[in-house]
A protein has these predicted regions:
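Extracellular/virion structural assembly segments
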Residues: 66-122
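Residue-level recognition of beta-strand microenvironments
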Residues: 151-154
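Polar/acidic, low-complexity leader/linker segments enriched in S/T/G and N/D
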Residues: 1-60
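Short coil-to-beta-strand transition motifs
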Residues: 54, 136-148
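Active-site-adjacent substructure of cysteine-protease-like catalytic cores
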Residues: 120-141
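Ubiquitin-like/PB1-type beta-grasp interaction modules and other compact soluble beta-rich domains
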Residues: 5-9, 157, 177-193
């Protein structure tokens, strides 16, 4: 991953569009599979189909992701809302996952938000296999934002909504996991003396 190209492109007078991609990775212990779902909202690039980024296909899927902004004094807890009308429907995926861990509702699944610029997308996305915005670069992206599904907020016929959290902001996770004592770390308490 290289952030230099995207930060230099974003500062240009006429930067290309920011493309937002998502991966949802299931945990075998919690969900009974390690399936990776890749999708995009389809709102950043004028396309009704998939987007190919770094050799991976991201399917167009109605999704709304909000709340990624960092605020003073607290970590973001974004909300991911996904259409329940697709094929397969999110409810069907939840039923499969809940057979392994009842009532799990994808809790603990890893969600990665990937953002790049249109000029760095694979040439396969464009007619003639040529990117009209620039040279494809599968390593040029903003820093990835990694979250885990903390809880399902709502589910109905139309949408399913989850609250995401950073790994150390999940329920039941304490930091530090290892207690620092003088017997394990002899230099504790010696600073400033």
């Amino acid at each position: 991953m290289s952030t230099d190209p995207v930060f230099s492109d974003i500062q240009k007078p006429n930067p290309s569009a920011i493309i937002e991609l998502f991966t949802l990775t299931l945990d075998n212990a919690l969900h009974g599979a390690t399936t990776v779902y890749r999708f995009h909202a389809g709102t950043n690039l004028d396309t009704n189909g998939k987007i190919v980024w770094a050799g991976n296909e991201y399917l167009r899927f109605p999704v709304q992701a909000t709340g990624f902004a960092y605020q003073r004094g607290q970590l973001p807890r974004p909300t991911l809302t996904v259409s329940n009308m697709g094929s397969p429907s999110i409810s069907a995926i939840l039923l499969t996952v809940n057979q392994t861990t009842a009532g799990n509702d994808l809790t603990g699944a890893k969600v990665v938000r990937i953002r790049t610029m249109a000029r760095f997308l694979d040439a396969a996305n464009f007619s003639g296999a040529t990117n009209p915005f620039g040279t494809p670069d599968p390593t040029a992206e903003f820093p990835q934002e990694i979250y885990y599904i903390d809880r399902k907020k709502s589910e109905n016929r139309e949408v399913v909504s989850w609250e995401l959290a950073a790994v150390f902001d999940l329920a039941g996770i304490r930091s530090p996991k290892r207690q620092c004592t003088r017997s394990l770390f002899p230099s504790i308490g010696t600073f400033g003396q």
